[in-house]
A protein has these predicted regions:
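Primarily recognizes the serine-hydrolase "nucleophile elbow" in alpha/beta-hydrolase
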Residues: 141-190
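Gly/Ser-rich "nucleophile elbow"/oxyanion-hole loop immediately N-terminal to the catalytic nucleophile
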Residues: 70-76, 117-149
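Bacterial N-terminal signal peptides
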Residues: 9-19
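The feature captures the conserved acid-bearing segment of alpha/beta-hydrolase catalytic domains
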Residues: 174-245
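A domain-start/cap signature at the N-terminus of enzymes
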Residues: 23-78, 211-213, 223, 253-254
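Short amphipathic alpha-helix adjacent to the substrate-entry channel of hydrolases
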Residues: 90-107
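Active-site glycine-rich loops that stabilize anionic/oxyanionic intermediates
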Residues: 84-88
Length: 254
């Protein structure tokens, strides 16, 4: 089996969908920033980690920044995997209220910015699910991948190569159309939901619009272009991120 297929199968076993009582009893205190450090060997075992050694050395420490949603929900949260163009994966302050309201765990890898090779960034983003599963409970039916600028381009690769893992994606000021020779299941991609979030002053606006239109032409009908008035090449505020996530959640199970 292809490494990507093996990893996808492994990730699909991570999500835990729990009853109200078991979730309330098991989940740690929320509304907090957390930090995870581990290696591919610890997450995958020696044999599986060896398959990725050319991308990530088996003894290399990988770290992620996490925000656990602070709310009174009795339901297991979904997951929002963020790929930053910068070295830090930490959530920006205005987005905490979005994660609280949408009941999503935020996780972003450190040392996964634009200077890092794309394959490594993709592995860090997908392994985020495994890392979370060792510590927290979440609903695997509500998984979103997102990224900004170059991170948005990487998120678009992750979304197209792991459509069975991530049911939705928010591409912020950067996205690529999928390559069919790298996408195992285009039909599954077309079932998912996508938001192309950009601004009227973003230098990538035209490219984002073209990629969005390419998605529609390919049959990804559940796609939305969200253009923020006055926004340049930047992260959206809480209101616009909420609009994007609300659109994705329209297709999520209750």
């Amino acid at each position: 089996m292809h490494c990507g297929s093996r990893l996808a199968a492994s990730l699909l076993g991570c999500g835990l969908i729990l009853s109200v009582n078991s979730f309330a009893d098991a989940q740690p205190a929320a509304g907090l920033d957390q930090h995870i450090e581990t290696t591919t060997t610890e997450l995958l075992g020696e044999e599986e980690a060896a398959r990725y050694r050319r991308i990530v050395p088996t003894d290399k420490t990988i770290s992620w920044e996490i925000y656990l949603p602070g709310n009174d929900s009795s339901e297991a949260p979904g997951v929002f995997v963020y790929i930053s163009p910068r070295a830090s994966g930490k959530i920006i302050s205005p987005w905490r209220e979005v994660m609280d309201r949408e009941n999503l765990i935020y996780i972003g890898a450190n040392k996964s910015g634009n200077r890092i090779h794309t394959n490594r960034r993709m592995v860090f983003a997908t392994l985020a699910i495994k890392a979370l599963a060792t510590r927290y409970l979440f609903d695997a039916r509500k998984m979103i991948v997102s990224g900004f600028s170059g991170g948005g381009r990487v998120a678009s690769l992750v979304a197209s190569q792991y459509p069975e893992v991530f049911q939705g994606a928010v591409y912020i000021c950067g996205a690529n159309f999928w390559k069919e020779n790298q996408t195992r299941d285009v039909e599954r991609v077309l079932q998912n939901r996508f938001v192309f979030l950009t601004g009227t002053q973003d230098f990538n606006l035209l490219e984002m619009r073209r990629t969005y239109e390419h998605y529609l032409e390919a049959g990804a009908k559940n796609s939305m272009l969200l253009v923020v008035p006055g926004m340049s090449h930047d992260l959206p505020d809480a209101d616009y991120l909420t609009k994007a996530i609300d659109y994705l959640m329209e297709g999520a199970p209750p």
